[in-house]
């Protein structure tokens, strides 16, 4: 999507397609050789990195079984969409930028604009689909496990492409102005005011509002759970300080034996005294001591279950046990707060990158068609805004995949050709 067509008039395009600059624009129609070389190197590097990054994400999901789940299907579809932007749209946009004029003819121009709008809009809407999937997963985790199916992912993906088609096709069906094709050296999308509002709101402003609402609620839900964990830990620590050991909690183990159950007593009776061993015993409501047993279940999981003990009442935990639990409670509290900070950072990166890349373009896309005679857009600024939007297709795989440890392991396998050996 070109925000400003090189060296042209102050006519705009709707997102995400080329703009033209008007007579008030500062720029040159005849570019220098050094400009062409430098621009070619910069844009060529951006395109190469975008193709490589998105192709690696697609390959990782296709080759690594552990990555083949509904959440990653959406990320994989996003990578395919950004790969289409990188292969089908960016080369023509780069040529347009380097030559400072459109040289591929009107038919190719129409195809370029349609692909530009379709792929960039679908890419943005994929980010909404991922946000919606994450919102359902964190706010309704129990029920959504059964609803989170490949069919639902396919429906979300299909919806993103359908909306993209509904936004990209109208100019080809006549929703444009007579001036849109008046200059053979320029390639611009419809400057019709109605289409400008329709396309900018459908492709960006409504998705932006939806993402802000969804990620805002995701953050609130995550913060609520984290702080609930902190309060629970602090309450457990307070109970321990007053003489009662905390109730045993379920924990996982990888030592389970398939097809059988192993029962092991976590506390053993000692003659001549009460039971007190690393917090595995607590005073029951009926005064009886509770022993902890470990249950090894099929599926490599271990659970701790309290059972009444035949021993008598248990004395309070020793001071060393209290200090240990206080330290554990403080450590868990710090971990919970660190998780909250990480959540803020992650959501900030996701929304910050999206807004930084696309907001400048869509502000220009919405405003410029309504002030053609009075608005002034420097050519260089227009090019920066334009390619800032395109760069989102390069950054998406970094944000949604490369920060994920499972994807990192798959990428290492790809680099070391482990999949080839298999």
UniProtKB/Swiss-Prot annotation:
Keywords carried by this UniProt record: Behavior, Cell membrane, Cell projection, Disulfide bond, G-protein coupled receptor, Glycoprotein, Membrane, Receptor, Transducer, Transmembrane, Transmembrane helix
CDD domains: 7tmA_5-HT1A_vertebrates
Domain of life: Eukaryota
TM region(s), chain numbering: 39-59, 74-98, 108-132, 153-174, 194-216, 347-370, 379-403
Positions annotated with a glycan in the UniProt record: 10-11, 24
Motif interval(s): DRY motif: 133-135
Region feature (Disordered): 1-23, 235-263
Matches recorded under Gene3D superfamilies: Rhodopsin 7-helix transmembrane proteins (1.20.1070.10)
Binding site for 1D-myo-inositol 4-phosphate: 314, 345-346, 352, 403-405
Pfam families listed in its UniProt record: 7tm_1
Residues that bind serotonin: 116, 120
Matches recorded under InterPro entries: 5HT1A_rcpt (IPR000610), 5HT_rcpt (IPR002231), GPCR_Rhodpsn (IPR000276), GPCR_Rhodpsn_7TM (IPR017452)
UniProt activity-regulation remark: G-protein coupled receptor activity is regulated by lipids: phosphatidylinositol 4-phosphate increases HTR1A-mediated activity.
Cytoplasmic topological intervals: 60-73, 133-152, 217-346, 404-422
PROSITE patterns per UniProt: G_PROTEIN_RECEP_F1_1 (PS00237), G_PROTEIN_RECEP_F1_2 (PS50262)
Bridged cysteine pairs (disulfide): 109-187
Motif NPxxY motif in this chain: 396-400
SUPFAM superfamilies membership: Family A G protein-coupled receptor-like
Recorded topology in the membrane: Multi-pass membrane protein
Topological domains annotated Extracellular: 1-38, 99-107, 175-193, 371-378
A GO term for molecular function: Gi/o-coupled serotonin receptor activity
Function: G-protein coupled receptor for 5-hydroxytryptamine (serotonin). Also functions as a receptor for various drugs and psychoactive substances. Ligand binding causes a conformation change that triggers signaling via guanine nucleotide-binding proteins (G proteins) and modulates the activity of downstream effectors, such as adenylate cyclase.
PANTHER family: 5-HYDROXYTRYPTAMINE RECEPTOR 1A (PTHR24248:SF191), ADRENERGIC RECEPTOR-RELATED G-PROTEIN COUPLED RECEPTOR (PTHR24248)
Subunit-structure text: Heterodimer; heterodimerizes with GPER1. Interacts with YIF1B. Interacts with GPR39 and GALR1.
Name recorded for this polypeptide: 5-hydroxytryptamine receptor 1A
Name of the gene this protein is made from: HTR1A
């Amino acid at each position: 999507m070109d925000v400003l067509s090189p060296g042209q008039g102050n006519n705009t395009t709707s997102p995400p397609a080329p703009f033209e600059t008007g007579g008030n624009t500062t720029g040159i129609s005849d570019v220098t050789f050094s400009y062409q070389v430098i621009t070619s190197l910069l844009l060529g590097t951006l395109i190469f990195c975008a193709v490589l990054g998105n192709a690696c994400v697609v390959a990782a999901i296709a080759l690594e079984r552990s990555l083949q789940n509904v959440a990653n299907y959406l990320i994989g579809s996003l990578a395919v969409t950004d790969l289409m932007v990188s292969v089908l749209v960016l080369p023509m946009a780069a040529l347009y930028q380097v030559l400072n004029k459109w040289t591929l003819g009107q038919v190719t121009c129409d195809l370029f604009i349609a692909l530009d709008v379709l792929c960039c809009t679908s890419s943005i809407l994929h980010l909404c689909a991922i946000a919606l999937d994450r919102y359902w997963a964190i706010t309704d985790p129990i029920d959504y496990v059964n609803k989170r199916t490949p069919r639902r992912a396919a429906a979300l993906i299909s919806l993103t492409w359908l909306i993209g088609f509904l936004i990209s096709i109208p100019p080809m069906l006549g929703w444009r102005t007579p001036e849109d094709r008046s200059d053979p050296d320029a390639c611009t999308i419809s400057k019709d005011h109605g289409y400008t509002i329709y396309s900018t709101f459908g492709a960006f402003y409504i998705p932006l509002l939806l993402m802000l609402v969804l990620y805002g609620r995701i953050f609130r839900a995550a913060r609520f759970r984290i702080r609930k964990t902190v309060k629970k830990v602090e309450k457990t620590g307070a109970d321990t300080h007053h003489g009662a050991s905390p109730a045993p909690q379920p924990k996982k183990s990888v030592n389970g034996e398939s097809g059988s159950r192993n029962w092991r007593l976590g506390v053993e009776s000692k003659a001549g005294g009460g039971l007190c061993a690393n917090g595995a015993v607590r005073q029951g409501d009926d005064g009886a001591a509770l022993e902890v047993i470990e249950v090894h279940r099929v599926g490599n999981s271990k659970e701790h279950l309290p059972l009444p003990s035949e021993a008598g009442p248990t004395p309070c935990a020793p001071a060393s046990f209290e200090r240990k639990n206080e330290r554990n409670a403080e450590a868990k509290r710090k971990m919970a707060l660190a998780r909250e900070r990480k959540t803020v950072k992650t959501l900030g990166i996701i929304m910050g990158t999206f807004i930084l890349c696309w907001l400048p373009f869509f502000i220009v896309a919405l405003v410029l068609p309504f002030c053609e005679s009075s608005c002034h857009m420097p050519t260089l600024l227009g090019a920066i805004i334009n390619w800032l939007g395109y760069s989102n297709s390069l950054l998406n795989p970094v944000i949604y995949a490369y920060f994920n440890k499972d994807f990192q392991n798959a990428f290492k396998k790809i680099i070391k050709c482990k999949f080839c050996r298999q």
